[in-house]
Amino acid sequence: MKELIIPNALKRGDTIAAITLSFGSAGLFPHRYQQGVHQIEESFGVKVIPTPHALCSPADIYEHPEWRLDDMMWAFKNPDIKGIICNIGGSDTIRLLDLMTDEHFETIRNNPKIFLGISDSTINHLMCFKAGIRSYYSASLMFGYAENGGIPDIMVQNTKKTLFETTPIGELPHSDTFIIDFVDFGASEQPKRPRILTDGPRFIQGTKTVQGRLIGGCTDVLMMMAVGTKLWPAPHDFDNAILFLENSEERPSPDYMLYWMRNLGAQGILKRINGLMFSRPGNDKFTDDADKQNWLATYPKFDEVILKALKEYGRDDLPVVTNMDYGHTVPQLILPYGAMCEISCTSKRIAILESGVKERE
């Protein structure tokens, strides 16, 4: 993998830009947006400000992808902005790509700073990767950091360790519960969502300890929009990497996971990587509790198709971990692109061996 520029650490008192690069949720649900702003400011001692168009209506955001790109450049160029967080994901960030020139990528590269996002923001992470800077796969402002009842403590501690400290991140913790139910951003009351017990990460294949630099994102976005574009990483960027993947809330089935895995195999990516990590599959479209239980019962089926595809492509030796705390369920740990990660199949341990950020010069 190519070497990435590492952004400076955050400090209390810093200003963070909240940006809308896909769906205009912040303009549609201002109370949810403000809840996320308040919880981030209270938990980390930073100031959150919107980019110029971040609070526009969904219709205006959709009609003006150039506004979104302008906001992204504004945030990277502004020396007072020390970090950028996406308000939410969506489905059309890819429309910004047609507007981007070499100058836009140079702006990102010449102004490295923390960039946070999830889901459709995978496209923006690939923009940062192409520009040559580290970005951070994380919760968004309105999903995760705006969680009802406060940001989960495991996320607060992980965010501080990853973005505010310059010592190695170390072993990734795991939560004994997770949240998957739909949250109505527009509801007048925002009660705590129910938690589901979990045993934590599942080490479903592999017998050794491996290391590799992190690369990945939302599988739906990677395999249905990014692949084949100029954002798709070069083959050598997957060499000896640890690939992290996660499914969106659109509830793609295990069959889709099998198709996507076969695509990775056909590209030769599965043969290049040192390890593979998956979050819990997301889904916020339950019709009732029985539907939710049926969905949770599919988790082992995802494991089965992952192993099936790996066997088809001769990688039944590859260390694989599923059921991890990132992606479209809460809590969501931060995964820094390009950071050296270690998977130990014997000790059932995942660690990031270096710091997420660097000291300010």
Task: Put a short name on every predicted segment.
Residues 80, 105-114, 133, 273-274, ...:
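A short helix->loop->beta-strand "cap" motif at the edges of active sites that frequently abuts
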Residues 1-80:
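ATP/NTP phosphate-donor binding region
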Residues 102-128, 134-142:
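Short, acidic/small-residue loops that bind anionic groups at enzyme active sites
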Residues 18, 84, 120, 222, ...:
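Buried hydrophobic positions in well-ordered alpha/beta secondary-structure cores of metabolic enzymes
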Residues 134-219:
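Conserved anion/nucleotide-ligand pocket segment
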Residues 254-361:
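C-terminal active-site/capping subdomain that shapes the small-molecule cofactor and substrate pocket
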Residues 76-101:
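Long, hydrophobic/aromatic-enriched structural stretches that serve as scaffold segments
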Residues 214-254:
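Oxyanion-binding "anion nests"
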